[in-house]
């Protein structure tokens, strides 16, 4: 049977459906172990979560695992040093999967600094973390997704990207101008072109509008007596 848990605050916020793909009873002796695969799906209501769970059950955990391993193998970076290779690829995949996600309701791409509830701005957007720290790994992992992430910087996050932290919808969470965050998407664009040799991104109107926006904001923070920008 498929079990469903709904989280509500007025209307349903989300639903989690879970199941396992085994039926037999398992008895374990001391020091024995057995792996059980549980299928967990999430939706904005019980029907959606349950139907996704049923679909994954039909495909089976073995097939799903094989498909995911294939994705990881295609992304794998070959490094001669075995211990270094393990570390690099572990960090590459962690950076990719934990810094990016999609919204449940609209399936829009969102970028975030942390998913941990222990972090004081969990699931918030920081331009520094996304475009200066995580971005090179995202380019290595998925070039198409990296370009999509740049487009977010040219649109959703453009107006407020210089502020300390934003909600994932682009509104200001923590005020405070930070110079490196203002120019972070431009630095990321340069890195993208350097790594992919795809300079067509410079021709899209949103990029040109972003450059104009950044130059306009810079003027407000320039101190002519020092020749420096405040931050």
Where are these regions (language model features)?
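Aromatic-rich carbohydrate-recognition surfaces in CAZymes
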Residues: 34, 57-60, 64, 121-226
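C-terminal ends of transmembrane alpha-helices
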Residues: 98, 102-104, 220-230
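Conserved alpha/beta core surface patches that mediate binding of polyanionic ligands
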Residues: 19, 166-170, 231
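Acidic/polar, glycine-enriched structural segments that form the non-catalytic walls/loops
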Residues: 1-124, 200-201
């Amino acid at each position: 049977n498929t079990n469903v848990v709904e989280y509500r605050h007025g209307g349903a916020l989300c639903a989690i459906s879970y199941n396992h793909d085994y039926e037999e009873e398992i008895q374990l002796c001391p020091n024995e172990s057995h792996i059980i695969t549980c299928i967990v799906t999430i939706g904005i209501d019980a029907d959606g979560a349950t139907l996704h769970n049923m679909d994954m059950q039909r495909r089976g955990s073995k097939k799903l695992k094989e498909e995911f391993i294939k994705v990881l193998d295609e992304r794998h970076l070959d490094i001669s040093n075995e211990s270094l290779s393990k570390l690099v690829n572990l960090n590459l995949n962690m950076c990719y999967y934990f810094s990016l996600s999609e919204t449940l309701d609209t399936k829009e791409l969102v970028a975030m600094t942390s998913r941990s509830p222990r972090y004081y701005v969990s699931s918030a957007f920081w331009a520094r973390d996304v475009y200066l720290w995580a971005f090179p790994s995202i380019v290595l992992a998925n070039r198409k997704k990296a370009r999509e992430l740049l487009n977010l910087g040219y649109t959703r996050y453009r107006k407020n990207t210089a502020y300390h932290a934003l909600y994932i919808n682009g509104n200001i969470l923590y005020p405070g101008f930070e110079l490196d965050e203002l120019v972070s998407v431009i630095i990321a664009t340069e890195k993208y072109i350097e790594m992919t040799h795809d300079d067509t991104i410079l021709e899209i109107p949103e990029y040109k509008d972003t450059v104009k926006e950044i130059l306009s904001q810079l003027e407000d923070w320039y101190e002519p007596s020092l020749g420096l920008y405040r931050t």
